[in-house]
């Protein structure tokens, strides 16, 4: 899965953002496990997943603050 685009994230509802973060956290767990066992081929995906989570959380906070 490629890095998520900001425009795609902004189009998500808050529930979709929560689901996306949960899925990315599961993916990060699996990637860490693969790295530990020496099975991870695409090491850059760990960085992408971490940054996708941060990107989603940042946009969610911006939306939440904009409502106030």
From Swiss-Prot:
GO terms for cellular component: cytosolic large ribosomal subunit. It comes from the Bacteria. GO terms for molecular function: structural constituent of ribosome. Pfam families: Ribosomal_L29. The keyword Ribonucleoprotein applies. InterPro entries: Ribosomal_protein_uL29 (IPR050063), Ribosomal_uL29 (IPR001854), Ribosomal_uL29_CS (IPR018254), Ribosomal_uL29_sf (IPR036049). This is Large ribosomal subunit protein uL29. Belongs to the universal ribosomal protein uL29 family. Coiled coil: none annotated. Keywords: Ribonucleoprotein, Ribosomal protein. It comes from Nitrobacter hamburgensis (strain DSM 10229 / NCIMB 13809 / X14). GO terms for biological process: translation.
């Amino acid at each position: 899965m490629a890095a998520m685009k900001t425009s795609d994230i902004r189009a998500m509802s808050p529930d979709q953002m929560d689901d996306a973060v949960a899925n990315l956290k599961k993916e990060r767990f699996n990637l860490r496990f693969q790295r530990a066992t020496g099975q991870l081929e695409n090491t850059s995906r760990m960085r992408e997943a971490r940054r996708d989570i941060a990107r989603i959380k940042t946009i969610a906070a911006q939306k939440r603050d904009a409502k106030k």
